[in-house]
């Protein structure tokens, strides 16, 4: 069985966010096996695909090294990249059946465009301990699936060195649980993107994620309102890599656009365990 490593939301290899994607299965492997392989891969996400009777429709599940995720943008883009580019699936649009409903991906020039549910955040008080964990006091805090800490400027975002142990237990009013915080600011003048962010997810076993599609389901509604824009470019400033997304508000949905690059193809030397 083949597995690929794809750099998603990237401008080239060794950029963006790597995800592992398995060749599609006829039946789901055992959950424990999928979790064990995700831990072995030790990437932020490993994506598993399931064939259906329709050539353009697949089941899709995402596992971090420690648990199954309810939604993952970069691994969805990676899965679509594998189907389109590595396996030659010749359809106009892919549909994925997931824990977050049906997600669609289509080609958009040299990018892939994903249609995800919007997660408009609500303004909230600064949770106890958050400023200390981040090492900076946010100007504003918002809550969607993740906490969103708005800070003064891009330099603050880039220089942040949070206490991940302390951050892991802070959830505030976030619906996705503790230990998942986006730190964000408007970009510096002259940047070719409008918003810059970083995403820390020690609660999911991920100290920092290089490029996070699901976070932009929160950030696009938030900064679309702040900046009066229906479409924005975002940069996720993970040190040494960085991820780039174009996002568009579509009411209850958000369109996420980005590119994927295949950096590795490998062969598993074991058979998947079954439930």
UniProtKB/Swiss-Prot annotation:
EC class name: isomerase
Keywords: Isomerase
Active site: 45
Keyword Signal appears in the UniProt entry: no
InterPro entries: Phenazine_PhzF-like
Annotated EC: 5.1.-.-
Top-level taxon of the source organism: Bacteria
Short name of any one Pfam family annotated for the protein: PhzC-PhzF
Protein family: Belongs to the PhzF family.
Protein's name in the database: Uncharacterized isomerase CC_3221
